[in-house]
Amino acid sequence: MTRKLPPRRLLAVAAALALIGHQAKAETAQPGRTTPEDTDTACPLGTFHCPPKPPSYAMCRPNAMLDFYDPTLSRDPSLRETSPTSVLAQHVDSSDQSVYHLSGDVKLDRADQKLQADSLDYNNVSTDYDARGNVRYQEAGQLLSASHMQGNTNASHGIAHDVSYQMLDARGNGVAEQGQMFDAQRTRYTRATYSTCDVGHHVWEFRAKSIAIDKTTGVGVARNATMRLGKVPFLYLPYISFPVNDQRKSGFLYPVFGKSSRGGFELSTPYYLNLAPNYDATLDPRIYTARGPMLGGEFRYLFPRTRGQFNVQYVPDDRGERVGLEDTKDTERYLVNFSNVTRLWGSWNLISSINRASDSGYYYDYGEDLATTGAVVRTLSSNVAVRGAGKWWSAAVGATVYQNVNPFVTDASLQYRQLPYATFSMDVPLTPWLEFGMDTQAVAFRKPGYIEGEREDLYPYLAAYFGTPAWFVRPKVAYRYTAYQLDGDFQKYGGSRGALLGAGGVSQFTEQSPTRALPIVSVDSGLAFDRSTSLFGSSYTQTLEPRLYYLYVPYRNQNNLPVFDTRLMSFDYWQLFSPNQFSGADRQMDANNLTAALTSRLLDENGVERMSVSLGQIHYFSPQRVVGNDWVHSAYVAQFGLQLSDRWRLNSSYQWSPNTRMTEMGSFELQRRVGDDGILNVSYHYRRNLLEQYGVSGVYPLSDRWRLVGAVAWSVPDGHSVEAAAGVQYDSCCVALRLVERNYVKQSGYGLPAGSGNQRDNAIMFEIVFKGLGSSGHQIDSLLQRDILGYQ
């Protein structure tokens, strides 16, 4: 069975446009009046990725034409040929046996058609009709009112004069001197207007010599049209096509206009190709005033066993100035992204993600528009893997490579390539209280100029669980065996990173096939007490949950083992209960530790957690030789969360070390909802000798239509902001506008220290959305969703 890609809405124009905007997305409207269900539910507080709000018509006034809309009427025009015609009226003159003269609340119904008028002449033989006075007509897909309407019910054609019309599958409406229905699917309006705004309050509209509506293709076509904002014409369009339902169609998408410090002014005029129901493409030619032309493209496909997307950007001759370590001026440049998922058999899939740039400075030069500057990109990864999973197991075989896209560093900063890797995990319940599991991995690590080799890691375990809702004990016994096979010239490398040694250097790698084997034993236990309490007049359940976690791992000297993909993780609350503080298999910490922690929660009557506070610390019975400290205690780690209502929340964490007698880490995040459509975030993050930063972000509604957006991150050590964004948004019944400017210290994101040539860069973008006609593709949303928690 052929599958269909999701629809894309667009504006098709047969002339070069000077509009400001970008790619359009699907928009539909309900045929009835605006109801409370049309409004969007606010994203819950604390949600990291809130979906963009779809175009909303909640601010639109009800169309008076909908007063005669009959929702019980059929929406199937094909029933006309087999359905009888029903005519009702207060007065009927049938002196002519073939022509009936009806007056007084006349109604004519057949299948999806309904005609109302003050008077009507109906020929029972030819089925011709002539309606006059307060004519109202409904059929599948549209409503219209007119002063006079003539037609034939069998042929499904008619002509109406002095027309006002309303589309039912979209909010499109307008007026026309004449409306002509050729059949059940095709209508043409002469000297007509079209808009999705409130009737009589068109913020935008186009006026055309003719507007043709084809319900079969879902396309409307206007000829000799002028686009107007209010009453002011600003663009002549000899030909314009637009969607009248949610079907996809080929045509121009809205252009995008932006500006960045390295690209200059940018103009993009994408063209969408609806090739088939299950695959499509977009061509995206661009002009950068500071760099020259670019051709971009996207191809999407969806088949029963495979789906994917291919994106490419190509610059034939870059005119920009050199930056970083590579000279790319007057060269070809490109970026390729390919993703694919193919079902092979059963639960096995082939998953591919290929990303490649022509040079290390590509993202630095072409990543400044707001669509791609949500985060600094330093490394591109490409992965191809075959993955499978069952009820108790998962496995994968694949390869991963990396490309450096930081123009200020060499490829030495890259991670090891994994060529190839294989993983297998299982977790099998043996009894209701006993389970057996295993995590295994085999990887070949490759990196020019550094020690290379293969590593196998085997990690089986046996765990039991005893407990009730009031207590639990979870003993676990594991065994970790790690083996290496280093390349033949392994003794030429040394140091903490395994780099090539110079003359006279001595390698710490003494064996070509070193191994490490050790047991890992832990016992996790806890109690849970609860009581009823009240706070601020509300009833809650308060819990008290003490927890003890003992971990024993014997010491193994691992100095002769290379470090391929392992890092010491940042210490946090969950590290109190972790068997290893290292992220990879190259290092396994030794331990003879006991963690003591205490948590208390407040749960409301629905079981929703409204407050939680946790405090914990590790006691070391012996020095940590692999990590490298002889502390008796770890830092105190505390967490606090509070959300007594759905309109605000507070999260905080804190670490204080009795060893250094200093604060090691602290964070504070406050989120407050402002009105129905606003949000305010205040944050502070600190990590000793690494980071101290304040942040404020939010969306502030000025009115139902206007709102301000902004975010700023201030670095205390640097004494200035590292990133700031500010903008304004306007949203009405039928038009939405977004304008955002971003100012940031770009080089700091690429790891350069302060004072090493850092400069402030800027990017600006403007989006316009004519609701129901097309949109810009939410380019700005990706940036604001990252910088403003809870943004929609």
What would you call each of these model-derived segments?
Residues 4-5, 29, 34, 42, ...:
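Selective for proline/serine-rich intrinsically disordered segments
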Residues 26-183, 269, 273, 358:
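Post-signal-peptide, soluble extracytosolic/periplasmic N-terminal scaffold domains
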Residues 13-17, 106, 135, 458:
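Hydrophobic aliphatic residue packing
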